[in-house]
Design a protein with these regions (language model features):
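ATP/Mg2+ or Mg2+-diphosphate-binding catalytic cores
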Residues: 338-347, 360-421
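ATP-binding pocket architecture of kinase catalytic cores
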Residues: 55-233, 237-250, 269-277
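Intrinsically disordered, low-complexity cytosolic loops and termini enriched
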Residues: 1-21, 171-195, 269-270, 337-342, ...
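Catalytic activation segment of kinase domains across protein kinase-like and atypical kinase folds
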Residues: 259-306
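Catalytic-loop of the protein kinase fold
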Residues: 248-254, 258, 264
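Active-site activation/catalytic loop segments of kinase-like enzymes and analogous catalytic loops
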Residues: 293-338, 358-376
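Juxta-kinase regulatory segment immediately upstream of eukaryotic protein kinase catalytic domains
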Residues: 1-56, 220-227
Length: 421
């Protein structure tokens, strides 16, 4: 697939860093600790006419997200929203899953390209950034043509214009050595997950997570060994495939669920209107150099929400429309569409997304197995892990022909993927 001219890699990117506050958020003392953080960033909010309130968002299943508003006397709702700030505190133990230094670097890079809100400060267990006025989408919204075309266009802009940040030692951060085998160095295992690819990347992230899986029981050890074998299979099948971006990797969001898609004000078209919506993306903690086809397949999986409702996943025609919009936007951003066969590029990317459709289930299945151990959030991660991993097994059975050979019925998710309309 043709590579985007503007999409390359940046080694050791130098960006102006935001200040780091020597404070933390305490969930047991939410109001006071959050207020202290906000006043450090906005000392003017301590004025007599200020009235600070916090609104808790409950859509996420990893972090605590608070919207801080100041109902200052004389301010309109417009004024209040314009000055609003978001405070995001990291979930318990999530450093094993997420490189927080890299997350901040992602945010700063996206700011440089006008694709992220201003990052105001970091603190010991989170960050503070400006609120983006708009409407958070629901899984149902993602299935609306005006929205999914807007998502396709914005995602293509990310992939075509934002360079990947790569570092020779970036995979080394905060590795829990639960899964290290014998005398092997876990850092070396991670960095060599996909030989020849700059690190970090989708493959090194999954390798890091597999090494972090609990291995306290025989069942856990056997599961880790099984998942390790599957990762090696996936890497062999996918890591060297040609694709968009330098080395077949783009700056990918990797977590484009409905809660991370914001429809900007006054951009949602009325029913019957041909006007297109405009969206932006938030939360960049999982953003990692990855194949574009993975990022798209991962987003398609989110049409079903956390409930994994396979009945509403995009049909062939919906995927085709999304991918064609993506391709047009990608090459418009990277090459001005000069000499590009849009139809041919759409077919190629559509085929790649089809191939990648099982990988998001593997990715989030491993993630959920770790969350089941470390998270304090009220969510059934263990069941979610089994659901997502079953998506991968179903895809592999279909790919290898095992399901048909055994005379088994095609699973619902695979049937939906085959559905035309």
């Amino acid at each position: 697939m043709t590579q985007g001219a503007n999409n390359g890699h940046l080694n050791g990117l130098a960006l102006p860093h935001v200040r780091i506050l020597p404070l933390s958020y305490d969930s047991e003392d939410s109001q006071q600790s959050a207020t202290r953080l906000i006043l450090t960033v906005r000392p003017d909010w301590a004025s007599d006419d200020s009235n600070i309130e916090f609104i808790r968002f409950t859509d996420g299943i990893t972090n605590t997200l608070l919207k801080a508003i100041n109902k200052r006397k004389g301010w309109s709702k417009e004024d209040i929203d314009r000055e609003a700030i978001l405070l995001r505190a990291y979930g318990n133990g999530t450093a094993v899953l997420i490189d927080r230094e890299r997350e901040a670097q992602n945010h700063e890079l996206l700011m440089k390209y006008g694709l992220a809100p201003e990052l105001l400060a970091r603190f010991q267990n989170g960050m503070i950034y400006r609120f983006i006025k708009g409407s958070v989408t629901s899984p149902e919204d993602l299935r609306k043509p005006a929205i999914y075309r807007a998502v396709a266009s914005r995602l293509a802009q990310w992939h075509a214009t934002v360079p990947c940040i790569t570092h020779p030692t970036s995979a080394n951060s905060h590795v829990d050595e639960n899964g290290a085998n014998g005398d092997q160095d876990p850092d070396a295992i991670i960095e060599n997950a996909a030989p020849g690819k700059p690190v970090p990347n989708l493959w090194t992230v999954m390798q890091k997570w597999i090494l972090a899986l609990p291995i306290n029981t025989q069942v856990q050890r056997e599961r880790q060994e099984k998942l390790q074998r599957e990762l090696e299979y996936i890497v062999k099948e996918f890591s060297q495939r040609p694709g968009l971006g330098a080395d077949g990797l783009v700056f990918a969001h990797c977590d484009l669920l409905s809660g991370n898609v914001i429809v900007l004000p006054s951009s949602l078209p009325a029913k019957g209107s041909k006007k297109e919506a405009t969206v932006t993306f938030i939360d960049y903690e999982y953003a990692t150099p990855s194949p574009a086809a993975f990022d798209i397949a991962n987003h398609f999986a989110e049409w079903g929400g956390f409930d994994c409702d396979y009945n509403v996943l995009p049909t062939k025609s919906q995927r085709r429309e999304f991918i064609e919009e993506y391709v047009r936007s990608y090459f418009r951003c990277s090459q001005g569409n000069t000499g590009v066969d849009i139809e041919a590029e759409t077919r190629k990317l559509n085929d790649e997304v089809d191939l990648f459709r099982g990988v998001p289930g593997f990715y989030w299945g491993i993630w959920a197995l770790i969350q089941a151990v470390i998270s304090e959030i009220d969510f059934d991660y263990a069941s979610y892990a089994e659901t997502r991993l079953s998506e991968y097994w179903a895809w592999k059975e279909e790919k290898e022909g095992d399901r048909a050979a055994a005379g088994k019925e095609m699973p619902l998710r695979e049937r939906r993927w085959e559905q035309m309309e």
